[in-house]
């Protein structure tokens, strides 16, 4: 007799963005004459640059000839792309072996699957946090039961205005998820701040899973774009990154994960974790699609970087427009300078979902309730800078004119 995985019963009844979609559909059905302006999910909106389109076409064309056709590629990724990714770190004075780079179909699956190569242990996540980290921990059986929305075995690293959205060290944690620039708060971390977690992880033989998916949005040259800019991080950290937001590949699907050969965990010699991840990938993953990998190669060229930077600048200008609009209304907000997200306080301490409904009903703008990212997100709200400029401007204008404060 077989049953279900009981850990799934501890998941929230609905995924955050599914609930947003449900409420938005209900509003649209009740008011079909109104246009809803979406500043919610962080999905890219602008067309891919010409050089990238040409590269993707090239990838398709290669499949049209017997001489250039390719079937399955290496599970770890195209060797040229792995080298190009490793070389891209040199600008930050980081030397990677291409064999430490594993090409993926985007960051999300690796962020969840990485924990499968580690034994039981305590997981720590920032609070508020990207929901996938928490749901992954629940499914793996490491989170324990939920009591009033708090998971008994999960360590919550509180990030708020008081601590500058950078958490204090936990008493104990075996696997630590960190994300900078941060989703949802838009906060960044300094090298000195990250060093405290690297030192903690080395002392305790813990592993940091560092989500760097928004690193391309960092404009401040003093801020680190990679955890490996921190001395010792190669001994304790795995970095996950993606072409989704930096190159507009949300629908194309391509990313990478760095697993250093020098990474050390309890009862495992250097190289073991890299070997285990390689074994895991060759068992469960047939490799990223050949076509996106052709695009990824061009993203990392000088021309590709210039074209992608222009789109990043476009989204950051959207963020500036949103921040300015909130400031004009006297609403406190954070982020949006080195990240595409703006994290705002709800007026008068209003509950996040109550503000979602108020914003939708009064201004026809959709955002993301902060509490959906964790208990410490209550009383906050995330707005996304991913959108067409005309929609961003219309949304900010509607908030200015119609939000009753």
Task: Enumerate the language-model features and the residues they cover.
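Conserved glycine-rich beta-strand-loop-beta hairpin in the small C-terminal domain of fold type I
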Residues: 293, 297, 312-323, 333-346, ...
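Conserved core segment of the aminotransferase class I/II
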Residues: 147, 229-313, 320, 324, ...
């Amino acid at each position: 007799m077989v049953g279900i995985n009981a850990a799934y019963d501890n998941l929230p009844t609905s995924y955050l963005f599914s609930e947003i979609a449900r409420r938005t559909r209900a509003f649209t059905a009740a008011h079909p004459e109104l246009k809803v302006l979406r500043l919610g999910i962080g999905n890219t909106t602008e067309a891919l640059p010409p050089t990238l389109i040409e590269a993707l076409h090239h990838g398709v064309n290669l499949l049209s000839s017997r001489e250039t056709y390719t079937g399955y590629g290496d599970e770890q990724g195209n060797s040229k792309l792995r080298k190009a990714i490793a070389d891209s770190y040199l600008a930050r004075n980081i030397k990677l072996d291409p064999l430490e780079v594993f090409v993926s179909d985007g960051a999300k699956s690796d962020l969840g699957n990485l924990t499968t190569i580690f034994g039981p242990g305590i997981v720590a996540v920032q609070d508020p946090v990207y929901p996938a980290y928490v749901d992954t921990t629940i499914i793996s059986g490491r989170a324990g039961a939920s009591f009033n929305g708090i998971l008994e075995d999960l360590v919550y690293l509180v990030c708020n205005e008081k601590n500058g959205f950078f958490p204090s060290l936990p008493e104990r944690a075996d696997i630590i998820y960190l994300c900078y620039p941060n989703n949802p708060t838009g906060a960044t971390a300094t090298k000195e701040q990250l060093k405290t977690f690297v030192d903690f992880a080395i002392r305790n033989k813990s592993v940091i899973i560092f989500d760097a998916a928004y690193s391309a949005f960092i404009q401040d040259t003093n801020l680190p774009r990679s955890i490996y800019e921190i001395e010792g991080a190669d001994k304790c950290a795995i970095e996950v990154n993606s072409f989704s937001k930096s190159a507009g590949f949300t629908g194309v699907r391509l990313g990478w994960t760095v697993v250093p050969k020098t990474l050390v965990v309890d009862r495992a010699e250097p190289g073991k974790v890299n070997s285990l991840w390689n074994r895991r990938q060759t068992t469960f993953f047939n490799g990223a699609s050949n076509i996106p990998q052709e695009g990824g190669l061009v993203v990392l060229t000088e021309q590709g970087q210039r074209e992608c930077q222009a789109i990043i600048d476009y989204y950051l200008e959207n963020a500036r427009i949103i921040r300015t609009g909130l400031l004009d209304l006297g609403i406190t907000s954070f982020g949006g300078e080195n990240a595409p997200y703006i994290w705002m306080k709800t007026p008068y301490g209003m509950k996040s979902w109550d503000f979602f409904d108020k914003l939708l009903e009064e201004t026809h703008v959709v955002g993301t309730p902060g509490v959906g990212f964790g208990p410490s997100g209550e009383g906050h709200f995330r707005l996304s800078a991913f959108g067409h400029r005309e929609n961003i401007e219309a949304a900010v204008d509607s908030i200015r004119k119609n939000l009753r404060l």
